Amino acid sequence: MKEILYRKSIQDRVRIKGIGLHSGKEVNLTAHPAPSGTGIVFEYRKGLEKASISVELSNVVDTSNATTLGDGLHKIQTVEHLLAAIYALGLTDLILEIDAVEVPIMDGSSLPFLQALESAGIVKYPEIIEPIYVQNPLWVVDGDKYLVLLPSDELKVTYTIDFNHPLLKGQNITISLDKETIKQEILPARTFGFLKDVEALQAKGLAMGGSLDNAIVLTQDGYLNQQLRFENECVRHKILDLFGDISIAGRPIIGHYLASKAGHALDISMAKLVMSSVTGDEISKYKSRRIPLFKRKVAVV
């Protein structure tokens, strides 16, 4: 039996403080309750600068390394970890007030966001939000990378990563997910990166907030971190990213996701593809303001 979902917000505002991954500077984020139908909206406030950026597919302006939302003048980077926590809680209406151009990295997972939002209490509205159950296979492809979505009455993910590293060669997982399983098995998984890449980025003034406190760091043949939260934490984090990205569609998209070496670009392409195929809207409706709709080869059945 398919679940009936209701629009939700938080009961009280909650403040979240952390550092930006790239700037290394303090970021203040406040989540505010919002009326039913508001959607998820970032409110950027920095001195006299103000901007309102809705979380929607047409506002995705970059998918390199992280997912970035923008309005043509302003942008908010690295939104996916926060959005994954919002998705897991079923929240549909929030104002996210922020004083920087990137969401704080926290511990590199979605867990701090989940805990903060849960502490604010959850309010359920009478209005229903309808999940999307795909009726036909859909896929997006970029060379040897792909993301497939198959019809299924349950949310399920089969994900494989295949980096040129002894610990990440063919790391994979198949998992059936409900909201509680996502909270326990996916949201605690931290982002990961390679030491050589971190050093190169920091030499360019980027990733200044990156550390062992907020990322899994891999050396040539091992981990710098003393302990992992899961044996396959890295591939679990890719699922976290997937749901943070897919949630930008504005409706839960249910099916069996099959991913191999996918990432933010394919995640967003799939969300656009699903929304276009389900609503009957022209795919151009979801075209982002600054980047082409698909830089990827796309096939639809």
From Swiss-Prot:
Lineage top rank: taxon: Bacteria
Keywords of the record: Hydrolase, Lipid A biosynthesis, Lipid biosynthesis, Lipid metabolism, Metal-binding, Zinc
GO cellular component: membrane
One Gene Ontology biological process: lipid A biosynthetic process
Pathway: Glycolipid biosynthesis; lipid IV(A) biosynthesis; lipid IV(A) from (3R)-3-hydroxytetradecanoyl-[acyl-carrier-protein] and UDP-N-acetyl-alpha-D-glucosamine: step 2/6
Catalysed conversion reaction: a UDP-3-O-[(3R)-3-hydroxyacyl]-N-acetyl-alpha-D-glucosamine + H2O = a UDP-3-O-[(3R)-3-hydroxyacyl]-alpha-D-glucosamine + acetate
SUPFAM superfamilies registered for this protein in UniProt: Ribosomal protein S5 domain 2-like
Co-factor(s): Zn(2+)
Short name of any one Pfam family annotated for the protein: LpxC
Keyword hit for Hydrolase: yes
Catalytic site: 264
Enzyme Commission no: 3.5.1.108
Keyword Hydrolase: yes
UniProt: Zn(2+) binding residues: 81, 237, 241
GO molecular function: metal ion binding; UDP-3-O-acyl-N-acetylglucosamine deacetylase activity
Coiled coil: none
Function, in words: Catalyzes the hydrolysis of UDP-3-O-myristoyl-N-acetylglucosamine to form UDP-3-O-myristoylglucosamine and acetate, the committed step in lipid A biosynthesis.
HAMAP family: LpxC (MF_00388)
Similarity comment text for this entry: Belongs to the LpxC family.
Name of this chain's protein: UDP-3-O-acyl-N-acetylglucosamine deacetylase
Organism: Leptospira borgpetersenii serovar Hardjo-bovis (strain JB197)
